[in-house]
Amino acid sequence: MDIRFQNLGPEHWKGEIMLAPVCQDEVLTEICPQMDKAAPWLAIAPALRDFKGKTGELALMHGHPELAVPRVLAVGLGPREKVDTAGIRKAVAAAVQLCRQKGFGSILLPEPALARLPGGRERLVEECVCASLLALYRFTALKKAEKDEPAEPQWLALGFDGQEVPDASHAAARKGENAAWAVMLARDLASTPPNLLYPEKLAERARELAREKGFACTVLDEHELEKESMGCLLAVGQGSGRPPRLVILEHAPEGHEQEKPLILVGKGITFDTGGISLKPAANMHQMKADMTGAATVLATLAALAQEDAPRRVIGLLACAENMPGGRAMRPGDVVRAANGDSVEIQNTDAEGRLALCDALAYAQKTWTPAALVDIATLTGACAVALGTQIAGLFSDDADLAERIRAAGGACGEEYWPLPLWKPYAEQLKSDVADICHMGPREGGAINAALFLQHFIQEGVRWAHLDIAGVDWVSKPTPLCPAGPSAFGARTLLELARGGVL
């Protein structure tokens, strides 16, 4: 769906349907005169009498089919004092989904109707554009087209009140468009079956995007990983016929080549059986999305390059397939990490932290980061603690943690700080190695974060995002169908856009 602008005034607005966001108990024809001018028949629409503007309420009203704006969809936002950006985002997405179901090819969204709502004019433009595009997302690459499927809306136009489109509004719309593109890219990657997307293929896709969008991409194969002493990442992939890869991405726009980079590290386990510590069969198919962390990092770098963001950002994708087999790592194995420490493996289904620790060590050995953030579907313990709507955030840098929470909160991705409880580090001690890669079941998310922190050098600003639990949507929502959510992609993009760390 294209995003357009109409700025000749409401009398000249066009669209098969106009969205009209309304707070509870407001009179639709009085709150925004521009909407009344665009659809002068609205005051006598019978459905208007019954519309209350409650949260989630939608009312479709019809005028004469030959009019420039023949339909209005009233979108209820609930009580004004409770309206927020998250509610507006969800309401607009639900409205756009209804437009698709009805087969409307063009949608008009009056910008003056957004300007009167809380949240900030430009921010709401960005969020509504992003929400409208995400509302239409479906992973259909492997399916035949359905004969009776209604056509997708061709465009959504933001209507302005007879003025030039402000530069800030234009930029906000493009930011929303780019953010939605990044989320959809990450969802596509995480939805792709593991027989079609494995470490080499993910690396190939990264190279393609780098050529297309104009950022750098380097891939370390298994032989180069051996030279870099990445024994942990190699161990994760050694049971698979698909060798591991470390994908290195860099967006360094002109004038920013020498600045300290924001480094993003994503877990890229393209399929996770659990290895020798085999997972239960139920829902194992969802483990194709165990590379969501890597998908969000790749999507972020591509989106930054696409909008030519003035910030140097490096992304590392630690990619492997965790399979059982005669060569697979075993519980009790000891391997050597990239920082030189020996690591005892106790459970092969705790493989994500092994892949990440080598990538984190490599990042600090190669660059001096302004900040280092890893993102991973790491622990079921985090999902048990926080559920399916909030991700875990670990950091001993209060400023970095707050920036991440603010970035996520601005775009509907929420994080809850969890402790790096130092006494628990004692539980990672090993009798046979420098460190054991996991502790007891209790406090599992904390133990995993403490293991990663072991590989963070003194003075490096670091945060760990555990997105287990929020990476997969079981029931469809207005903003996401059932399946991979790409949670974290918008947070990372917002964080990278946010200026000096």
Curated annotation (Swiss-Prot):
Residue numbers annotated as active site: K279, R353
Subcellular location(s) of the protein: Cytoplasm
Cofactor requirements of the protein: Mn(2+)
Binding site for Mn(2+) 2: K267, D272, D290, E351
Single GO term (MF): manganese ion binding
Binding site for Mn(2+) 1: D272, D349, E351
Co-factor: note: Binds 2 manganese ions per subunit.
Pfam families with a match to the protein in the record: Peptidase_M17, Peptidase_M17_N
Catalytic class of the enzyme: hydrolase
Transmembrane segments: none
Enzyme Commission number, as recorded: 3.4.11.1, 3.4.11.10
PROSITE patterns, sorted: CYTOSOL_AP
Recorded GO CC terms: cytoplasm
CDD domains per the UniProt record, alphabetical: Peptidase_M17 (cd00433)
InterPro entries tied to this protein: Leucine_aapep/pepB (IPR011356), Macro_dom-like (IPR043472), Peptidase_M17_C (IPR000819), Peptidase_M17_leu_NH2_pept (IPR023042), Peptidase_M17_N (IPR008283)
Catalytic activities: Release of an N-terminal amino acid, Xaa-|-Yaa-, in which Xaa is preferably Leu, but may be other amino acids including Pro although not Arg or Lys, and Yaa may be Pro. Amino acid amides and methyl esters are also readily hydrolyzed, but rates on arylamides are exceedingly low; Release of an N-terminal amino acid, preferentially leucine, but not glutamic or aspartic acids
UniProt-listed GO biological process terms: proteolysis
Main location group: cytoplasm
Keywords: Aminopeptidase, Cytoplasm, Hydrolase, Manganese, Metal-binding, Protease
Function, in words: Presumably involved in the processing and regular turnover of intracellular proteins. Catalyzes the removal of unsubstituted N-terminal amino acids from various peptides.
Family membership noted in the UniProt record: Belongs to the peptidase M17 family.
PANTHER family on file: CYTOSOL AMINOPEPTIDASE, LEUCINE AMINOPEPTIDASE-RELATED
Protein's UniProt name: Probable cytosol aminopeptidase
Gene: pepA
